Amino acid sequence: CTTALNLPAYMPKLLHERKNSVLLFLPQAHSFARAINYICVASELHIYIAQGIKTLIADLQVAKPSVMIVVPRVLEKVYNAASQKAGHGAKGVAFAAAVVAAQNYMKEVSAKGKAGALAKARRMAFDPVVYASLREVLGGRAQWIVAGGAPLDPELMAFFRGAGVPVYEGYGLTETTAPCAFNPLGVPYHQGSVGVAFPGFELRIAEDEEIQVKGTAVFPKYHKNEEASEDSFTEDGWYRTGDLGRIDD
């Protein structure tokens, strides 16, 4: 599909190294999971299918994925497990401070393009005692963790990114064949952003702030539902997502 063909534009290195592997948490009926499957088969990558949220930690240790495709609930579970393991004593205090240090680091990166010396120092102080352990829980090889299917809490995103866990967020719908906006490598980090238009797509914001999409992978119509199909497109052919958003210059 078009989405699968466009993915190498964002993950060229990952998709051309056969030693890399992908762990999927999304259902196989999900359009993004399908697209990832297609490109992995084409790139001869190993694909692991997670058993479920209850076996998350064990699945991560078996797969040791380079790429993870997850819903926000998976990252929430990893965070909660780390917090509970730290407990309420001295380790708990250290973990809480590490969370704040990671978040503040990424907030400075988002606001200024880079973090200041103090934020860098605080972040580095927690790396060997907190962040490194977190990365090992995720299998120790993660280069790309894509969260989709629901909004990811910006504070949670800032924590993982600040801890050296490469979490990326995108935006899309089944009608757009999964992602139509994404955070590719090299695009500056902005907290709360879902990135830029995916190759082959155009995005615009209507007067009522609705996100509208046009592109080669946008569906043409609903099956045997002409009324819904007509209501879903503007007169000039843009798909009405029904979601609100804004585009930053």
Positions of predicted regions on the chain:
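Alpha-helix/helix-capping structural signal
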Residues: 73, 150-151, 217
